[in-house]
Curated annotation (Swiss-Prot):
CDD domains linked: Cyt_c_Oxidase_IV
UniProt-recorded name of the protein: Cytochrome c oxidase polypeptide 5, mitochondrial
Example GO biological process: proton transmembrane transport
Region annotation (Disordered) ranges: 149-186
Protein role: Component of the cytochrome c oxidase, the last enzyme in the mitochondrial electron transport chain which drives oxidative phosphorylation. The respiratory chain contains 3 multisubunit complexes succinate dehydrogenase (complex II, CII), ubiquinol-cytochrome c oxidoreductase (cytochrome b-c1 complex, complex III, CIII) and cytochrome c oxidase (complex IV, CIV), that cooperate to transfer electrons derived from NADH and succinate to molecular oxygen, creating an electrochemical gradient over the inner membrane that drives transmembrane transport and the ATP synthase.
Length: 186
């Protein structure tokens, strides 16, 4: 009878102790990993798979733990990192989360922002143009035509310039977009 009481008490106690030991062991392992991540041990694959999809629902403690573990692993040679660890490290560094998260902007906002920017630019250009100094006298068409005649009379640049035989270019006449071209003269 005494033996049956011992067996009955010890068997459930062993089972209970085993369960407690497993729970305590798991909790201690998690605590150790959070306190001192070992850079030599690989990070468990389930923690890394589909990280981009799970990142938004992970708790801040999980994120911090994973970042710390990856940081410790990256101190080792990169040849020892698994492909999942490399992908996770890249995604944490450059993924679409936090300040790099994709923001949805409506097309109307973009359109009206562009219209407002162009309008402000045109108004500023007009205001600056009205306050600008007048163009110098050397920019008038008469002055530039006289400069061409002067260059022909004094044979300035006789090989390829205005004084050369058969010259058909504009010479000193400025060729802005509002200046008449050679076709308009004929």
């Amino acid at each position: 009878m005494y033996l049956s009481k011992i067996i009955c008490k010890k068997v459930p106690m062993k089972l209970l102790c085993t369960r407690n030991a497993a729970t305590v062991s798991a909790a201690a392992t998690n605590a150790l990993q959070k306190e001192q991540p070992s850079g030599e041990a690989m990070i468990a694959r389930p923690r890394l798979v589909d990280l981009d999809k799970r990142w938004g629902i992970m708790s801040q403690e999980e994120k911090d733990g994973l970042i710390t573990d990856l940081y410790a692993r990256q101190k080792q040679p990169w040849t020892t990192l698994s492909i999942e660890e490399k992908k996770a490290a890249y995604w944490i560094a450059f993924g679409e989360h936090g300040p790099r998260a994709f923001s949805h902007i409506s097309q109307k906002t973009v359109f009206w922002g562009t219209v407002a920017g162009l309008t402000i630019g045109v108004v500023l250009f007009g205001l600056i143009r009205t306050q600008a100094a007048p163009s110098p006298r050397t920019m008038t068409r008469e002055w530039q035509e006289k400069s061409n005649e002067y260059m022909k009379e004094n044979k300035i640049n006789p090989i390829s310039g205005e004084a050369s035989e058969g010259f058909k270019g504009r010479g000193q006449i400025s060729g802005g977009i509002f200046s008449p071209s050679e076709k308009d003269k004929k």
